[in-house]
C-alpha cells in the first residue's frame, strides 16, 4: 500500500504480531465459550501453527549457520554478499529466496531479524550469493557488510523458475529484480530460447555488464 514504504521493517513486523495476538485471543475466547468436541481441533491446529511460526521462523530454530565470505560493491546502492555454510548447506535452486539474519561484526551494526532475499547465485558446494539493494533500514545497514560476519539462513522458499524452461519465454526484470534470473543464467546455458528485458538505472549497470557477457 501507499503507507508501506514509510514504515520501518521492525515496526511493520510488530503490527503483524498484534494481528497474531488478536487471533490467539479470539481462539481463547472461543474455547471459553465452549466448542463441540469435534471442532476443538480447529483452534488447536491454529495455535500449533502459530507456535511453529514463532519458534521455527521468527526465532530461527530452523535456520542454518553461515558466514559472510565475500562482499562486492554493485553500483552506488547495492552489494552482493557470498555466504559460506558452516555445517550443511541449503539445497537451493535459482529463482528461490531465503530468510537471513545478519549479526554484528567489528565495524558492522547488524540486522538480527530475518529478512527475505532472493538468491543471485547458487553453488554446488552450498555457498549462496545475495543481491542486496539499499531499500529500507536494514538493507541500508547491509551496505557496510564485511566478510566474517555470522549469518543465520532459513529456506529455501519459492518455485519462481521451476517451469521457466518448459517452453520459450520472455523474462522481464527491473533493478535488483534481476537476481532470480541472474542466478539461473550463472548456472550455464538455457535449454530453451529466452528473451530477457532488463530495465535499470546507471547505478545498477554492474549487473547489465555481466548480463552482456553471459549473452555473448
Q: Where are each of the predicted segments found?
A:
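FNR/FR-type flavoprotein reductase catalytic core
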Residues: 1-61, 129, 134-216
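Ferredoxin-reductase
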Residues: 58-152, 193-195, 199-202, 212
